[in-house]
Amino acid sequence: MSHVDNGFRSLTLKRFPETDDVNPLQAWEAADEYLLQQLDDTEISGPLLILNDAFGALSCALAEHTPYSIGDSYLSELATRENLRHNDIAESSVKFLDSTAAYPPAPGVVLIKVPKTLALLEQQLRALRQVVTPQTRIIAGAKARDIHTSTLELFEKVLGPTTTTLAWKKARLINCTFSKPELADAPQTLSWKLDGTDWTIHNHANVFSRTGLDIGARFFMQHLPENLEGEIVDLGCGNGVIGLTLLAKNPQASVVFVDESPMAVASSRLNVETNMPEALDRCEFMINNALSGVEPFRFNAVLCNPPFHQKHALTDNVAWEMFHHARRCLKINGELYIVANRHLDYFHKLKKIFGNCTTIATNNKFVVLKAVKTGRRR
């Protein structure tokens, strides 16, 4: 938890999930402050759009202007809602949209936190292109190291004339004026053939490893369980390739695809629809913070390729929460399978949570682990 006085209001903000007290991470950064310094209450007229507000620092500061918070992270929405409540600001002050929704027309101000992936930024800029006007003030911010020539060129290509500021506290801003430059259409998804199958895998803009199968998933797919029954979870499903393979290998089972990214869940649904439409009645698709709100003792197996970063920060907090949720929601003798980089040492973390852990396979970079829920002990 950290305090910030940004010129609009004094706030106490925390990350979601919360980090430990030993290695605390802030819920705001210099780029948030820098963006807010550019604004004056009197100049905000028309809809205010805020894109990729990771923990709600901008939305909370500007809540009196009833901003739209737009992004591809359910965790960010939960963080913003929690920080609004914590600062006694009505949750209804902020309207939440995911990146696939239509944006409000003719915004007066657009604030963008530059996302990690250029593909998501392009998708969002193309969506903005449909609604902004030459009078819309468009400002983007990020750590200086995360603003590249390619970032500026993308703003120029999609929206119009673009300039950048000097660095301040290692943050920089991008100012852009809409001039509607000529722009070729772009496909909504990027697609590729999955080796060894006749499947075409479709990927929306913010899906991890959207240009091809990542090497961790490739290794995991070589060691997926077969002959499972009941409900299986593809937790952190991404484009759904693991869940799709589970559907094929386990015809007696159903698969729940879960991710905090609406684009990931949309990609998973699309990939089942196009590659195994006959299996749709064995599928459920869920945008969620891991397995929050899901009843305990429900699933026979959970499979997970957990992230070890949140936005630009390295952290195992998301993975740790996934493991705890998996244990709670597994039936007795239910199994958790994960693939992870070897250096993360998840073996001992799983053993601490489940009381057991087995190495299924390993190579020079990755390890596949299995933990079994043996009883009600934590």
UniProtKB/Swiss-Prot annotation:
CDD domains: AdoMet_MTases (cd02440). Pfam families: MTS (PF05175). It catalyses: guanosine(1835) in 23S rRNA + S-adenosyl-L-methionine = N(2)-methylguanosine(1835) in 23S rRNA + S-adenosyl-L-homocysteine + H(+). Keywords: Cytoplasm, Methyltransferase, rRNA processing, S-adenosyl-L-methionine, Transferase. It is found in: Cytoplasm. InterPro entries: DNA_methylase_N6_adenine_CS (IPR002052), rRNA_m2G-MeTrfase_RlmG (IPR017237), RsmC/RlmG (IPR046977), SAM-dependent_MTases_sf (IPR029063), Small_mtfrase_dom (IPR007848). GO terms for molecular function: 23S rRNA (guanine(1835)-N(2))-methyltransferase activity; nucleic acid binding. It is an enzyme of class 2 (transferase). GO terms for cellular component: cytoplasm. Its EC number is 2.1.1.174. Its main location: cytoplasm. Specifically methylates the guanine in position 1835 (m2G1835) of 23S rRNA. Belongs to the methyltransferase superfamily. RlmG family. This is Ribosomal RNA large subunit methyltransferase G. It comes from Citrobacter koseri (strain ATCC BAA-895 / CDC 4225-83 / SGSC4696).
